[in-house]
Amino acid sequence: MPSLKDLRNRIASVKATQKITKAMQMVAAAKLRRAQEAAEAARPYSQRMGAVLANIAQNVSGEDAPALMVGTGKDDVHLLVVCTAERGLCGGFNSQIARLARDHARKLLAEGKTVKIITVGKKGADILRREFSALLHDHVDLREVKQLAFVHADQIGHKIIKLFEEGAFDVCTLFYSEFKSVISQVPTAQQLIPASADNEAEMETAGDAIYEYEPDPAAILSTLIPRNISVQIFRALLENVAGEMGAKMSAMDNATRNAGDMINKLSITYNRQRQAQITKELIEIISGAEAL
């Protein structure tokens, strides 16, 4: 049975923790609004970019098609780009993305494929390193980045394209969490290379309009596809930030409520024990008085 002093110390400790989780919840809520606006603003641009590529790709085939669109013609080496958060305390947000990437990697390895992994975010790297340390090809550290910008995604995109041009992989897949709401973030896998031009939503958006291109479609694709890779990565990073803040807000809200429940239980235990101690002392005083 803990002493009254121990209970007082524990209540004070839980109250201090509750203040921290409440503050973190408020900070996450403030950041969530900006992150959600940024993610929602990036979606139409990235979707329209995909629609434009889908439309142009219909006019290009054979030897004219850029390598980034048609790939190497092989399916032997897969590059997985796994985007997670740099920090924790956001529930299962990071583990869900890592689990999707891990399951995909296991499936590819079971099929005899070669897998290479680039991690963006410390938490994903920590999780995947436990099982796939030999497969980790590179890590992108964004811990010092205060505000995500397109240049950060562009650097990752250039790194991926350089590896492709060096023949380091055949297929590249991007893993991130698509933000749906504060309580819903969906782990998502998106193929970057070869560029997927047969996506139904993109084809529908592209429509049946007939365009003339200057310069020729192949030249336009050679410029747009690298740009699209960076755009899709940037969107994924923005979706991740919004999802992380939503998950963190929910996690800290639950932690704050759990701390409140624990404080109530400890307070009840403290009051009962204190009451029992007072009763015991009164009995001792009365017994002593009767003895006199």
UniProtKB/Swiss-Prot annotation:
Compartment(s) where it occurs, according to its Swiss-Prot or TrEMBL record: Cell inner membrane
Matches recorded under Pfam families: ATP-synt
Keyword Transmembrane helix: no
SUPFAM superfamilies per record: ATP synthase (F1-ATPase), gamma subunit
The entry's keywords: ATP synthesis, Cell inner membrane, Cell membrane, CF(1), Hydrogen ion transport, Ion transport, Membrane, Transport
Main location: membrane
Membrane topology, record value: Peripheral membrane protein
Function field: Produces ATP from ADP in the presence of a proton gradient across the membrane. The gamma chain is believed to be important in regulating ATPase activity and the flow of protons through the CF(0) complex.
Assembly mode: F-type ATPases have 2 components, CF(1) - the catalytic core - and CF(0) - the membrane proton channel. CF(1) has five subunits: alpha(3), beta(3), gamma(1), delta(1), epsilon(1). CF(0) has three main subunits: a, b and c.
Entry's family note: Belongs to the ATPase gamma chain family.
PANTHER family: ATP SYNTHASE GAMMA CHAIN, ATP SYNTHASE SUBUNIT GAMMA, MITOCHONDRIAL
Name of this chain's protein: ATP synthase gamma chain
Annotated source species: Brucella ovis (strain ATCC 25840 / 63/290 / NCTC 10512)
